[in-house]
Amino acid sequence: IEYCLRSGIDGIVAGNTTRSRDGLTTISEKKIEEIGNGGMSGAPVYKKNLALVKYVHEKSEGKLPIIGVGGIMSGEQAKEMLDAGASLVEVYTGFIYEGPALIKNINKYLAEQDSAPKK
């Protein structure tokens, strides 16, 4: 992060796929071995990527625009990513499964949250 700040980059993409299968409970160890290495995406990577966005935001003291990526499947998760320090979010797996309606639903949710009374 320090190098990124010193080098003058315009922003950072935080998150995406992972080769790690830690915490994956939907299939057996044997099946995981059969599938082999490769990038895992979607819901299983969300929490790690959310933590990564928080980490980058804190370490950069909010000086780097961050694109939060990885496992965002709803408006609620997009807002969490933005609240963690992302300037923008990127979706892919959710878009594959839900199509353009996901983008509409995320935008609608964010607009509703923006207009909600502040506590």
Named regions from a protein language model:
Residues 1-2, 53, 78, 103, ...:
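Generic structural signal for well-ordered alpha-helices
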Residues 3-62:
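Glycine/Thr-rich beta-alpha phosphate-binding loop at enzyme active sites
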Residues 11-21, 71-72, 76-105:
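Glycine-rich phosphate-binding active-site loops on the catalytic face of alpha/beta enzymes
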Residues 21-38, 88, 94-118:
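C-terminal helical cap(s) of enzyme catalytic domains, especially alpha/beta-barrels
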Residues 44, 69-70:
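Residues that cap or flank secondary-structure elements
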Residues 57-61, 77, 82-86, 111, ...:
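Hydrophobic alpha-helix feature that most strongly marks membrane-spanning transmembrane helices
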